[in-house]
């Protein structure tokens, strides 16, 4: 049985393996560790424990543990001779009955930055293929004449997906000259001839590469094009061949009348009726150009999902999950150079390099730390670890959400994938 353990001063892979009945090799593999490197105080590890024993960690509650292991709260309390309101103590041993995993769908986005695609990125894609329902290739860019600008090596990526019984997604964006374009979108939405040509080209491309989900990530669309975008999606839906699905990306909203160009065009209720599923970008509260904070704090994410559920069936919702963190220089000032994107593995390596402990914000459910670099500049880092993604998995269970969508491949986070299949059964449709 897998459990999450927070490293304390003096802990090592060997001492943790001995304490929890695991092996050093298992801990190293599951957490993507280098056996020669020391552990970081505050680092979260996943450990395969002996039998069905669980050892209470900081921040635990019976409810949280019952969610994590898919066991009814009352059953967990009864088998351990506890009341539902029992106070748990760090280190306390509990017995965890066998739970039942729910089936969900999963997506991961691939966004190559080089031509040809780096072999390391190709290998990373192959490695996580078993954990995916869909592989989203970002992106096919819409053009004003109704054609598509293809990303590099599309056939290769589509083949990798299908070889793993994963559905390749045709991700179409309104990106023009590197930015999402409202003007480009208006051309396509308002000209029937161009729109029909555009849809025809999309369907031909999807058939060519075996991409059985058509996905639109249209952002920064003019508010006055809201209804035109809904009509366009209905038009696409009516032309889809049998066996194909339609999906969209949505910005994170908490109400129908939320103002701002990023929010007004995305009509949750209409899209929930039209498309087969939606991907909600429940991340970037902490973003590169803003002050340091958790990228996907649990409270705001929950608020978005609750609103989404009021507008569409929860099984149509794919919760967005970042695989990245950010490293900000302090003090933060508007106009500073953007924060540096960083993987979970790289974040822990930074904490180790500068010999600083990792702290955990239980309100946001996110790890973070501060350090001073060689030039005396202070930094603040927020990222994801096994605790933070487990809190999101628990939220998915609580809200009955249909799946999860990861941005993006190439940012190592081995703990996530192991925990994903410990929590859920991943639906395969390929």
From Swiss-Prot:
Alphabetized Pfam families for the sequence: Glyco_hydro_18, LysM
GO aspect biological process, one term: carbohydrate metabolic process
Superkingdom, natural source: Bacteria
Domain called LysM: residue spans: 3-47, 52-96
Main location: other
Domain notes: The LysM domains are involved in substrate recognition and binding to cortical peptidoglycans. They are also involved in directing protein localization.
Family to which this protein belongs: Belongs to the glycosyl hydrolase 18 family. Chitinase class II subfamily.
Name of the protein in question: Cortical fragment-lytic enzyme
Source species: Bacillus anthracis
Upper classification of the organism: Bacteria, Bacillati, Bacillota, Bacilli, Bacillales
